[in-house]
């Protein structure tokens, strides 16, 4: 084992202990002060839109916090961020992804000249991803002539056999590429109006872009010019709109100097 690999495992150990302490503390506080903890979780939910999501009542998701499933999911997300290779201003990782036909391709295959490419990572079991899906579709409509868009379907955020919410979309964790492709096909019912591909079963793009549970990026000429903060708390398609308004010149308009 090399020094860099040893250092990675040490960082993973530290994160494991941090998450374990956070979850244990949260569990104790939820037992002693259930109403206060519930109000704190609901306050966080306001930022993601969960409290405005008509599909979910608080009892569908608040009690799942600090469970063992919560622990493993949060740990996976924190560990994944150690693999982040998508730096603002740097070259975008040219990961392998899979079209819904089953054909392999790369992220860079969707870059067209100097047109910005928006990457939208998420899954059907991620409530904020679906809640804000119409916002994303409006971006596609408004900038279709000057930018390109790609949805990369990654592992489920709240799979039925993982950190599950009641009344959520019923999808189990992907055991095979076919499972992931079937899950991504469900997204087509929402008319995404842009290409949809899936991450590999090695979760390469999700890891290198630190995209779990959802995230937005903008790439131009192979470089990252916008790196959205991790979801669900900071997943914001309207930030992408502001970026595209600066990068894209509407047809028939000339820049003013």
Curated annotation (Swiss-Prot):
GO terms for cellular component: basolateral plasma membrane; endoplasmic reticulum membrane. Disulfide bonds: none annotated. It is an enzyme of class 1 (oxidoreductase). Changing residue 185 to N: No effect on enzyme activity. Highly expressed in the liver, kidney and thyroid gland. It catalyses: 3,3',5-triiodo-L-thyronine + iodide + A + H(+) = L-thyroxine + AH2; 3,3',5'-triiodo-L-thyronine + iodide + A + H(+) = L-thyroxine + AH2; 3,3'-diiodo-L-thyronine + iodide + A + H(+) = 3,3',5'-triiodo-L-thyronine + AH2; 3,3'-diiodo-L-thyronine + iodide + A + H(+) = 3,3',5-triiodo-L-thyronine + AH2. GO terms for biological process: amino acid metabolic process; generation of precursor metabolites and energy; hormone biosynthetic process; thyroid hormone catabolic process; thyroid hormone metabolic process. The chain crosses the membrane at residues 13-33. Keywords: Cell membrane, Endoplasmic reticulum, Membrane, Oxidoreductase, Selenocysteine, Thyroid hormones biosynthesis, Transmembrane, Transmembrane helix. InterPro entries: Iodothyronine_deiodinase, Iodothyronine_deiodinase_AS, Iodothyronine_deiodinase_I/III, Thioredoxin-like_sf. It comes from the Eukaryota. GO terms for molecular function: selenium binding; thyroxine 5'-deiodinase activity; thyroxine 5-deiodinase activity. Pfam families: T4_deiodinase. Residues 34-257 are cytoplasmic. It is a single-pass type III membrane protein. Its EC number is 1.21.99.3, 1.21.99.4. Residues 1-12 are extracellular. The active site is at 126. It is found in: Cell membrane; Endoplasmic reticulum membrane; Basolateral cell membrane. PANTHER family: IODOTHYRONINE DEIODINASE, TYPE I IODOTHYRONINE DEIODINASE. Predominantly monomer. Can form homodimers but homodimerization is not essential for enzyme activity. Plays a crucial role in the metabolism of thyroid hormones (TH) and has specific roles in TH activation and inactivation by deiodination. Catalyzes the deiodination of L-thyroxine (T4) to 3,5,3'-triiodothyronine (T3) and 3',5'-diiodothyronine (3',5'-T2) to 3'-monoiodothyronine (3'-T1) via outer-ring deiodination (ORD). Catalyzes the deiodination of T4 to 3,3',5'-triiodothyronine (rT3), 3,5-diiodothyronine (3,5-T2) to 3-monoiodothyronine(3-T1) and 3,3'-diiodothyronine (3,3'-T2) to 3-T1 via inner-ring deiodination (IRD). Catalyzes the deiodination of rT3 to 3,3'-T2 via ORD. Belongs to the iodothyronine deiodinase family. This is Type I iodothyronine deiodinase. It comes from Rattus norvegicus. The gene is Dio1.
């Amino acid at each position: 084992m090399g020094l860099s690999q040893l250092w990675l495992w040490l960082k993973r150990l530290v994160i494991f202990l941090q998450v374990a302490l956070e979850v244990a503390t949260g569990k104790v506080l939820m037992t002693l002060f259930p109403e206060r903890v519930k109000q704190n979780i609901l306050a966080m939910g306001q930022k993601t839109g969960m409290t405005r999501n008509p599909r979910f009542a608080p009892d569908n998701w608040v009690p799942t916090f600090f469970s063992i499933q919560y622990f493993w999911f949060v740990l996976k997300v924190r560990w994944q961020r150690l693999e982040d290779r998508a730096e603002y201003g740097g070259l975008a990782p040219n990961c392998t992804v899979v079209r819904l036909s089953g054909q392999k391709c790369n992220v860079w295959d969707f870059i067209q000249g100097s047109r910005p490419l928006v990457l939208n990572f998420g899954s059907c079991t991620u409530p904020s991803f679906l809640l804000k899906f119409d916002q994303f579709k409006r971006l596609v409509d408004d900038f279709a002539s000057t930018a390109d868009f790609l949805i990369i379907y990654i592992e489920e955020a709240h799979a039925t056999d993982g950190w599950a919410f009641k009344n959520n979309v019923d999808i189990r964790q992907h055991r095979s590429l076919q499972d992931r492709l079937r899950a991504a096909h469900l997204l087509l019912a929402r008319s995404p109006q842009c290409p949809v591909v899936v991450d590999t079963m090695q979760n390469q793009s999700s890891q290198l872009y630190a995209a779990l549970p959802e995230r937005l990026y903008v790439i131009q000429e192979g470089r990252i010019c916008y790196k959205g903060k991790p979801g669900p708390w900071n997943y914001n398609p309207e930030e992408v709109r502001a970026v595209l308004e600066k990068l894209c010149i509407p047809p028939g308009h000339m820049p003013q100097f």
